[in-house]
C-alpha cells in the first residue's frame, strides 16, 4: 500500500527527499545546544570567564540560527511535497474514476467517492507532512540526545530509558485498538456526505413537501453517529498527554534527586546536570512528536486504505484486445441475454432476452416500473456487461468495440437528465465540442428546444445553473435530446426522455426524427403509448422478459398487457403501472 501511494509523488520526490534530510540536520543542531549551554556554565559563569561566555554564546546563536534556517526550509519543502502529493493523488483517483463502469460506481456510491477524494486525501496529506518532518526529526532527536546524555553519565541516562519504555508501552496500548475505530469514523463520513449531497441536490423537493424537519433529523443522526465514533477514538488518544506529563515530571524528579548527588560527589558538573535536563526535554519532546505522528497515522491509515481501494479498482468492462474502430450500421441484436447487477439483490433483472432491431428502425419499449427497460438499453452502449448471451451493434459484439467508438455512435439520453453549469451552447457541445453554432441550432430545432431558447434574452448564450435548476423539466429534456443528436449517432436511445414534455411537442420531436434522421436507429422508452405507437415495432417488457413484440396494431390484437395499458390511457388517462404493469 505504501509503495502504491509513494509512487504518486511524481515531480515532488526532490522536495520529499530533502525534507527528512533537512529535518535530521535541524534535530542535530538542536541536540548540540544543551552541551554548549553546559560549556557556558562550566567554562564561563563558574570560572568568571566572560570571554568564554561570549564565545560559547555566539556559538549558541550560530547553531540556533542554523537550526532555524534548516527548520524553515524543511517546513517549506514538506508543505510543497505534501500538497503536491495530495494533488497527484486526487488527479490519479479522478482519472481512474473516469474509467469506472456504472457497476464500479454502484460499488462505492457517489458520496463515498467524494469523501475519499476530499476528507481522506486531506487526512493523508496532513499525515504525510507530519511523517516527513516529525517521524524523521523525532527519532534523530531521540537517538542523538541519548548519545549526548550517555556521554555525560550513563547511569543517569537509565532514567530516560525507563521513561521511554513506559511511554512506548502506553502508546502501543492506545494506538492498536484506535486503528479499527477510525475505519468506522470514515464510513460515517460517507453517510454524512451522502445525506448532505442528497438534501442539497433535492432541496426544492424537500421544501415543496415541507420535509425540512425530517431531513434535519436524518442529518442529525448521521452527525451524532460520526460524533460518537470520533469521541470514542479521541477519548483513547487523550491518554497520550497524561502519559507524557507523567514521564516528564517523573524524569525531572528522578534527575533532580540523583543528579544533585552526582554533582555533590563531583561525578558531573552543574553545567552537565543542566544539559541533562535539556536532554530530558529533547527526548520527551521527541516522544511527544512521535505520539502526535502516531495519532495522525492512526487517522490516516483508514484513509490510505480507502484511497488505495479506488486507485486499485479496475473497470469491470475489460477493453477488447484488438478493438474494432468503426461501426458498420445501427443494427442491434440481443441473443439470449441475461443480466444482473453485481451490487444489487443478486437476482437477474433480464432473463434470456432475444430480439433484433434493423438499421434505421424505430423501436418503442414499454413496461412497468422495475420491468428492466433502462437495464436493457444500458447494455447497448456497454454501460454494463451482460451476464450471459451477447449484445451486438452493427453485427459486432459490443465487447469487441473500442468503448470510445461505441459510445460515440450510440448516443443515449438517460432517464435522469443532467445539465452542467455553463451556457446553452456549452451544454449542447457536450455532444460535439467542435460543433458550430449553426449545428447546435439545427439539433435544437429537431428537439423542439429552439422554441423556448429564442425566448431567452441571451438565447443560446443563456447561462444554465448547475444541474439545470433554472430551466423546467421539459426544457431540460429537450436540451439533453439536442445534445445527444449533435453526435450524429447511428443509434439514438431515449430513456423515458420526453416524460415531462407535452404530447404535442412529443409528437413534433418524433416527426422531426422520422424526417431528419431516418437512417438512425431509434429506441424510445416511454410510459405513454402515444409516444411509441408510431414506432416501427414496440417491445413490451414485463419483469425482465419479453411479453410482446410487434406493431401498435398487432399488439392491440394479441398482447393482453398492451391492450390493458392502451385502454386505461385512452379511457382514463392511466399509465402502465396502474394496469397490467407487473402482473
Placement of each model-derived feature along the sequence:
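Alpha-helical transmembrane segments of multi-pass membrane proteins
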Residues: 14-16, 22, 63-82, 133-140, ...
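Hydrophobic alpha-helical transmembrane segments of ABC transporter permease domains
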Residues: 21, 25, 29-33, 58, ...
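Helix-loop-helix
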Residues: 49-53, 144, 148-165, 232-306, ...
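Transmembrane helix-loop-helix hairpins at lipid-water interfaces of multipass membrane proteins
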Residues: 10, 16-73, 77, 150-155, ...
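ABC-type nucleotide-binding domain
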Residues: 325-583
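An intracellular "coupling" helix at the cytosolic face of ABC transporter transmembrane type-1 domains
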Residues: 11-14, 99-103, 119-132, 136, ...
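Short intracellular "coupling" helices and adjacent cytoplasmic loop segments at the cytosolic face
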Residues: 47-48, 83, 91-115, 119-121, ...
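Juxtamembrane helix-loop junctions of ABC transporter transmembrane domains
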Residues: 21-22, 29-42, 63-110, 114, ...
Amino acid at each position: 500500500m505504501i509503495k502504491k501511494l509513494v509512487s504518486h509523488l511524481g515531480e515532488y520526490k526532490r522536495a520529499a527527499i530533502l525534507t527528512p534530510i533537512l529535518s535530521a540536520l535541524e534535530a542535530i543542531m538542536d541536540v548540540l545546544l544543551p552541551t554548549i549551554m553546559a560549556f557556558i556554565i562550566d567554562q564561563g559563569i563558574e570560572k568568571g570567564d566572560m570571554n568564554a561566555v561570549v564565545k560559547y554564546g555566539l556559538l549558541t546563536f550560530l547553531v540556533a540560527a542554523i537550526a532555524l534556517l534548516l527548520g524553515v526550509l524543511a517546513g517549506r519543502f514538506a508543505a510543497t511535497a505534501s500538497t503536491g502529493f495530495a494533488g497527484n493523488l486526487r488527479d490519479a483517483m479522478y482519472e481512474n474514476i473516469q474509467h469506472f463502469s456504472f457497476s464500479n460506481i454502484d460499488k462505492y456510491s457517489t458520496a463515498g467517492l467524494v469523501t475519499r477524494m476530499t476528507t481522506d486525501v486531506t487526512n493523508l496529506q496532513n499525515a504525510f507532512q507530519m511523517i516527513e518532518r516529525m517521524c524523521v526529526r523525532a527519532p534523530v532527536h531521540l537517538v542523538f540526545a541519548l548519545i549526548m546524555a550517555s556521554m555525560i553519565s550513563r547511569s543517569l541516562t537509565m532514567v530516560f530509558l525507563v521513561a521511554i519504555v513506559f511511554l512506548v508501552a502506553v502508546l502501543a496500548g492506545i494506538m492498536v485498538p484506535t486503528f479499527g475505530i477510525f475505519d468506522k469514523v470514515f464510513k460515517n463520513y460517507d453517510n454524512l456526505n451522502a445525506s448532505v449531497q442528497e438534501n442539497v441536490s433535492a432541496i426544492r423537493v424537500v421544501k415543496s413537501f415541507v420535509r425540512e424537519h425530517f431531513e434535519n433529523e436524518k442529518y442529525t443522526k448521521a452527525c451524532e453517529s460520526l460524533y460518537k465514533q470520533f469521541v470514542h477514538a479521541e477519548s483513547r488518544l487523550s491518554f497520550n498527554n497524561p502519559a507524557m506529563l507523567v514521564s516528564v515530571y517523573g524524569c525531572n524528579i528522578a534527575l533532580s534527586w540523583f543528579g544533585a548527588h552526582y554533582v555533590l560527589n563531583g561525578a558531573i558538573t552543574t553545567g552537565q546536570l543542566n544539559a541533562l535536563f535539556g536532554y530530558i526535554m529533547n527526548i520527551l519532546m521527541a516522544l511527544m512528536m512521535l505520539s502526535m505522528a502516531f495519532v495522525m497515522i492512526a487517522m490516516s491509515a483508514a484513509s490510505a486504505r480507502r484511497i488505495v481501494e479506488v486507485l486499485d479498482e479496475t473497470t469491470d468492462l475489460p477493453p477488447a484486445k484488438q478493438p474494432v474502430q468503426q461501426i458498420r450500421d445501427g443494427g442491434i441484436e440481443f441473443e439470449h441475454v441475461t443480466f444482473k447487477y453485481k451490487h444489487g439483490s443478486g437476482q437477474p433483472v433480464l432473463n434470456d432476452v432475444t430480439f433484433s432491431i434493423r438499421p434505421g428502425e424505430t423501436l418503442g419499449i414499454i413496461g412497468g416500473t422495475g420491468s428492466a427497460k433502462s437495464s436493457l438499453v444500458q447494455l447497448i452502449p456497454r454501460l454494463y456487461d451482460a451476464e450471459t448471451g451477447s449484445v451486438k451493434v452493427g453485427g459486432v459484439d459490443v465487447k469487441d468495440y473500442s468503448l470510445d467508438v461505441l459510445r460515440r455512435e450510440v448516443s443515449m439520453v438517460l432517464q435522469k437528465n443532467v445539465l452542467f453549469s455553463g451556457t446553452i451552447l456549452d451544454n449542447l457541445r457536450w455532444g460535439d465540442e467542435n460543433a458550430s453554432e449553426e449545428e447546435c441550432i439545427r439539433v435544437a430545432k429537431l428537439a423542439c428546444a429552439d422554441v423556448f431558447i429564442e425566448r431567452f434574452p441571451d438565447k443560446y448564450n443563456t447561462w444554465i445553473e448547475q444541474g439545470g435548476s433554472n430551466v423546467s423539466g421539459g426544457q431540460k429534456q429537450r436540451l439533453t435530446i439536442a445534445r445527444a443528436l449533435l453526435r450524429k449517432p447511428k443509434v439514438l436511445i431515449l430513456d423515458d426522455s420526453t416524460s415531462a414534455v407535452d404530447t404535442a411537442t412529443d409528437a413534433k420531436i418524433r416527426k422531426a426524427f422520422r424526417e431528419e434522421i431516418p437512417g438512425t436507429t431509434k429506441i424510445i422508452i416511454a410510459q405513454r403509448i402515444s409516444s411509441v405507437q408510431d414506432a416501427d415495432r414496440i417491445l413490451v417488457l414485463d419483469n425482465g422478459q419479453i411479453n410482446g413484440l410487434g406493431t401498435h396494431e398487432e399488439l392491440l390484437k394479441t398482447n393482453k398487457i398492451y391492450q390493458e395499458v392502451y385502454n386505461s390511457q385512452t379511457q382514463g388517462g392511466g399509465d402502465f403501472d396502474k394496469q397490467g404493469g407487473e402482473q
